Amino acid sequence: MAELEQIKDIVLKAGTFLKNREAAGHITVKGASDYVTEVDKKVQDFMQKELGEKYPEIQFLGEEKSNEEIDFSGLVWVLDPVDGTTNLIHDYRRSSISLALMENGQTLLGVVYQPYTDELFWAKKGEGAYLNGRRIHVSKAETMEECMFAFGTAPYDKEKFGEESFRKIYRVFMDSQDIRRSGSAAIDMAETAAGRIDGFFERKLSIWDYAAGRLLVSEAGGRATDFEGGELGCAMKSSVVCGNPAIHALLVRKYLK
């Protein structure tokens, strides 16, 4: 098993690439509303090299090199080098690095780093969730009226999911205190784990978006599933909803199906 302190150190070092964002000006278009910068590439190259040297037996899956064959029954690193690339391009400082260690469809270790606030979230299966060394827990809200939610808009599939997503968002907004849109699913899931927001949902996420965050949420006492309440497993693409058990159940039952 990978050493947690070593992994945290690698992620913290990689965070300097986001803070020094001049290279973000070099942008490649991957698809509709889908971009990659030199920062994404530098973070992934750095982390793949560091992880490969220390743990050569563990497979690697990164967003910027996601076409390799992966055996998810074995150990695999799952990395989003910059979750919130569009934010990075605009210098809207809500981007993160998300790293998970998975095996057999389960996340064993999850780390999310927000370099602009220097907040490092981590969780190890069965050992709780932490923020900069402090144990964190999901909120205790029981009703929608108590809640502030975060959401994502599935911007890469606007034509397919745009109208549906905003119908769901509207229903949640009308019954809750308020809603927020950060542009980084990993941050939103981490902040759900910390109880700062009461729940998060997005129609279509990739495995590198949710792999670390789902462990943070579950180890903080919450639930993270797809919109139907099904386990996320190792789905390459999935809807994701998370929150404390009561709020998660409300979202699945009344708002997202």
Where in the sequence are the language-model features?
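Acidic active-site catalytic centers that drive phospho-/nucleotidyl reactions
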Residues: 40, 63, 80-83, 87, ...
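Residue-level signal for inorganic ion chemistry
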Residues: 18, 40, 51, 85, ...
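Short secondary-structure boundary/capping segments
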Residues: 27-28, 52, 67-70, 112, ...
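DPxDG-like acidic metal-binding loop motif
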Residues: 71-130
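N-terminal subdomain of lithium-sensitive/metallo-dependent phosphomonoesterases centered on the IMPase/IPPase/PAP
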Residues: 1-82, 256
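Short coil/turn connectors at secondary-structure junctions
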Residues: 56, 73-74, 105-108, 144-146, ...
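An extended, acidic
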Residues: 137-257
